[in-house]
Structure formats: C-alpha cells, structure tokens
Amino acid sequence: MSQDIFTPTRVTCQVGGKEIIIESGRMANQAHGEVWIQCGGTVVLVTVCSQPLEFDKGFFPLTVEYSEKMYAAGRIPGSFFRREIGRPSERETLVARLIDRPIRPLFPKGLNEDVQVLASVISADQENESDVLALTGASAALMLSPLPFEGPVAGGRIARVGGQFVLNPTFEQQAQSDLNIVFAASGDALTMVEGDARFISEDVIIEALEWGRLQILPLVEIQHKLRELCGKPKMNFTPHQDDEALVACVHELALANGMEEALRVPEKMARKDARKAVKDKVMETLKADPAWAENEAALKAVSDILGGLEKKLVRARIVNEGTRIDGRDTTTVRPIQIQTGLLPRAHGSALFRRGETKSLVVATLGSSTDEQRMDSLTGDVTKRFMLHYNFPPFSVGEVKPVRVSRREIGHGALAEKSLRPVLPADADFPFTLRVVAETMESNGSSSMAAVCGGSLSLMDAGVPVSAPVAGVAMGLIKEGEKFIVLTDILGDEDALGDMDFKIAGTAEGVTGVQMDIKITGLTTEIMRTAMQQAREGRLHILEEMAKAIASPRKELSRYAPQHAEVFVNPDIIRLIIGPGGKNIKAITAATGASVDIEDSGRVSIFAPTAEALEKAREMVSYYDQRPDLGKNYNAKVRKIMEIGAIVEVLPNVEALVHVSQLDVNRVEQPGDVARLGEDMLVKVIEINGDRIRASRKAVLLEEQGHPWNPEDTARPQRSDRGDRGDRRGDRGGRDRRDRGDRR
C-alpha cells in the first residue's frame, strides 16, 4: 500500500537561523529517490532515477537538470507558447553544474548505470535562494536511492554584510554583500566552491569557507537520519578489478617502450603522439601474445591501465623530484605573450598566450538597447555586461560537433563574475558591454586566460575599469600527509591531480573563485597554501599584462558607438516620443541613433558617429527649447480668440499674439488675419515666466525697414485700440446679465 501523501517522512534542522525541511514520500513515489526540500516559501522537488546501461559508454553517464517553474513565483512564461520550453536558461545551466560538480566524484568508478537527477523549483518566495536547496536535495535523494553514493554533501551560500558572515542570505542581503560564495561540503571537508567577491583578501575567503562548512553540518546529519528512516536498500556493486597479471604485463611493456620518457616531452601534441606510440607498441605486443590475443576484455582495459600508470608516474615525479610534465617547478607560471589591438575594426581586442593556452578576446560596446533581457522567477531581468567563452574543437586538435556546451557557459560565467567588480557604474559609463573569449589553443587554464584577455580587451576598448584582473588555476598532488600545490596547471595535471582551484582578482584582492576537489580531507593548510601561491602567480601575471597595456585607453575606438546625455523637461517626453513613437523613429531613421528616455527626463543617445550623435542631440533638444526674446519663429496657429491668437512657437511652447500685434493696420477680427492650423511668422516680444507674447506686426515692420524696438511693443492698454464703442452694440454681443432664464 502506498504511503499517505499527507504523512511524508520529514526531517528538519536550523541552518543560518532558518528552518530547512527535507521530506520524502509526498510527491514522486515511483522515482528511485525523491525529496521535497523547503526553506521559507521556497520549495525544490528533487528526483533520482537510474537504469542499467546496455553497454559500457566509457564514462559515467550522470545527467543533472535544474529547472525553474514560472508558476513557482506566480508568473506565466513569456514565450509564445506560454510554457517552459526549449533549452535551459543560463541560470538553470549554471545551477545544474553547481549540483553536478560535488556529487559526480561520489559515485564509484565503474558504475554501469545511467543516472538522472532532476531538480525543479515549484515554489519561490523571492527571499530564499533555490540553488543551494537543490544541491542539498540532490544529495538527499541520492542517499535515499539504491545507487551506491558516497555522500552526503550539503550546499550553502556565504555573504558578508557589514563585515559579518551571513549563511544563505536573502536577495536583499546579497545586494549589500561584498562576498557571494556557493559551496558544498561533506561532514569534514569542502568539495566545491564557486563565487565572486569585491577585492576580498585570501584570508577572509578561507575564514568564510571554514565558517560556512561548520554551519551546514546539521544538513549533513539530517540526510543520514532521513536515510535511516526511509532509504531504499542499496544495490550490490563490486568495483571492477583488472587482472593483476594483465596490469603487470602492461606496466612492464609500457616502461620498456619509453613511457617515462614520453611523459617528459614538454609540448602537448608531441607528448600525446609519444604516449600513443607507447600504447600502440603495447597493444601490438599483447595481440601477438597467445595469452591475451583473444581476450577482448583485456585488450579493452589497456587504455585504463595505461592511464593509471601515467597518473602514478607523473605524481611520483612531482612529489619526489618537484618537477612537472613540462619541466617547470611547482610555482612557476608558464611564459606569457600578449598583443592588444590586433583586430582593426573591433572596439577592443587582445591575444593572451600562456604556454600552450591561447585566447583571442574581443570587447564590443553597445547601447542600452543591446542589454540582455531575461525572464526569471524574480521578474524581467536585464544584463549590461556579458562574457561569452567559446571552446572550439580545433583548440585541442579534435573533431567534434560545434555547439555551446555547459562547460563553456560555466567558464564564461566564472570569467564574467571575475571582471564585473572592476567595471564602471552605469551612470558613469552607460554602454552595454559584451566580451567574447575565443579559445585558440588549450593546454589548461583556458578560463583564466579568458579573464586575463577580457581585462586586456576592455582596457584596449577604452572602458574605464578600476583595475586590471588576472586569473590562475591551481592544482594539488596529495600523497598521504604530504601535499604539493601546483601553480598554473596543464590540462594533464588537471586530469591527474586532486584539485582544480581557479582564482581571479586584482592586485588588491580576489574577485572570482572556483574549486573542485577530488579527494576528502582538504585542510585549511592546503587552502591557505593554494591561495597564497595563487596570489603570487596572479601578481606576476598582472606585471606581464601591464607591459602590454597598463591602463585603459583614453579614448574609445572610432568604430565604437558615440554617446551623449540630454536632460529634458519630463513634461515633453511625450512630444519627443510622438504618436506611436513617430518622432523617435524619425530621429533613428535620420541619424541611425538609438534614443532611450527615462521618466526623469534623462535622455541617453547612442549613435554610430560623432556627426550622427550631434544631429540626434539637436533633434532631441528641439523639443525642449525655450524661445529667445526678439527672435522670429515660424509658429503654427493653435487657437483663435477674441483678444488675439494662440500660436505654437516651439514644440509645447505657446505664445499669445494680441489682436493689436497681428498686423500693422487695425484688425477688428483676429480670424481675418490668423487661420487655424496655418503658419505665421512672429517675433517673441515678451517673456514673463511661462507667459509669452509674440507679434506678427513687429515682423512686418522689420520687413518695411523699421527695426523692432521693445518699447514699441509694450503691453497695450485698453486705450491703444481707440474708442471701440459699446461692444455689445458694435459687435453684436449680448449682455450676459440679461440672458433670461436658461433653465
């Protein structure tokens, strides 16, 4: 009999002053693992399902998906079909990676199961973040499932507000914070770190992570408790063991055919060829040996056995000799070469090379209309700075489908958050910025090359960044109690090592950090050593960057958009826009400029050239002019009255042309001279605050050779018109006092 949905199994704990609830049995009971995790009004449903693989894919097929349901925040999707369709958003992809990275290493090697973890945000209270809940929920669901999982882990977010650490801050607290780090930890060690900071010292980050790890221990404990209450029996899994005789034979053949020498070749592609040559010789020998020739499983296992030997040899050399694959010691950064301004039509460009890793990074400036607009649980969001990281297959000499991968989105996000703290405020530099990092070749740390190249390209474009930013990737080799931290790791060192720790920042402090750890027991001592060594490497890279370009260029590229701001009276905004946007469209058509108007009257103009900018500014300012005393205007008659005519001398600026000023001769009826809707050339003869008087008579006198004298057009007295008699009699008017009973 199925469990009553109203009585799920529940565990709770207090974390960061908030209650977190994890329960199972309410929702997806046919999933192999399922939890509902809640904090405040934010709820995430996480499910786990698995099925045996029909054949060995050569890798562990773990799929993690995170989705934000718009109904969770009481919103309807903005897509044409009004439903969540298409590929995941950038945020959904990044959160899925946050979940994947700490749980993937906790599955045993050789697990022949297709595993899918789905996390869905089904309620969002606009206060409590869902990403860290999803991470913890994924671990809890895996703990309940039959899958072998060496967890649990828990996730948390650390902010620093007013000098005090805050765990799982609200959105408002995050906006006030100078630190924003998401992390995952088991009971005694960190397993994943991702975050950004505003020039925070290494010591503060270490302190924050250690503090945060201790704060989330209750989340680890209640997962064990939930497992005891309702966990499914774990499947029997026996890790694959290679034939000892085969392992010994492969090792002997590899060493005899130059494996150690191949691993000392400093160039990546040459080393790859040398290793392949060793493998080919080993396979050739085994296929000629009757003991192994017909054993397909043994021949298939050779690649993994050789990989294990390579890892053992490289790690032993680093530990025993302090020498790395390319001959460097443990703290040396690879040689750096930089070229800026190499693309003639780009707004800013830089080619950054560090060893065999090279990135072409290009900065583009746009207008406010180029901002990225996104539909999210918190409402419509705009993004003024974007960094896109591309990793084409040719960068590593491979043939693969060309599409944007999750890895590329993740690396771009890390580089973006590392550069964002040095960007000028919107009010000081209102351009939209897009930086694209094209990886030309890669041998490790390409994301950090994107950070360095991004900083250089922004300075080349003339963006007034507050300081240059550099990044470096750190590695770790840990054997027993002995550990060695590696600066500026190669791709092979990333694969063979125990940690990938990327740190970016300025000379003042850290701006971005990302860490993935493959082992348990990452001590504070290791963290401190890695952070200090990374700082030394970062400062060295910043010195090399300063040799190419030390500060932002004083002027923008002549191909960049030109910008100006105009402040107008808010009352005339509707005039500038025009009916149906007619006037704005006319400005754009005439100049190619984009015009953005705020309710405050601030008008931001972006144009392709300086000439177009000036023309657009004049066209906007035309609607906000004030008339000059004594100046002639081709006015339009808007209203005819007994005392004269109301004319529009400028947009939204009206003046009275008194009947005595309509002509050089006496005018009995204003309509005899003024025609509604027609143009009339007039001179402004008086400005008294918002009251303006104009004269057609003064213009006519000037045409007859009589210059205008302000005294000639002084405000008329009633006697100026002479004796007009009884107006009721002469004009046929009626005495308003004798109108009879109008009821």
Swiss-Prot record:
Pfam family, one: PNPase
Chain ranges of the S1 motif domain: 630-704
Gene assigned in the entry: pnp
Single Gene Ontology BP annotation: RNA processing
Molecular-function GO term, any one: polyribonucleotide nucleotidyltransferase activity
Keywords from the named record: Cytoplasm, Magnesium, Metal-binding, Nucleotidyltransferase, RNA-binding, Transferase
Residue ranges annotated for the KH domain, each copy included: 561-620
Reaction equations catalysed: RNA(n+1) + phosphate = RNA(n) + a ribonucleoside 5'-diphosphate
Top EC category: transferase
Domain of life of the organism encoding this protein: Bacteria
Disordered: region residues: 702-743
Family: Belongs to the polyribonucleotide nucleotidyltransferase family.
Biased composition (Basic and acidic residues): 712-743
Cofactors, names only: Mg(2+)
Entry-linked Gene3D superfamilies: GHMP Kinase, N-terminal domain, K Homology domain, type 1, Nucleic acid-binding proteins
Binding site for Mg(2+): D494, D500
Function: Involved in mRNA degradation. Catalyzes the phosphorolysis of single-stranded polyribonucleotides processively in the 3'- to 5'-direction.
InterPro entries to which the protein is assigned, alphabetical: ExoRNase_PH_dom1, ExoRNase_PH_dom2, ExoRNase_PH_dom2_sf, KH_dom, KH_dom_type_1, KH_dom_type_1_sf, NA-bd_OB-fold, PNPase
EC number per UniProt: 2.7.7.8
Compartments reported by the entry: Cytoplasm
Protein name: Polyribonucleotide nucleotidyltransferase
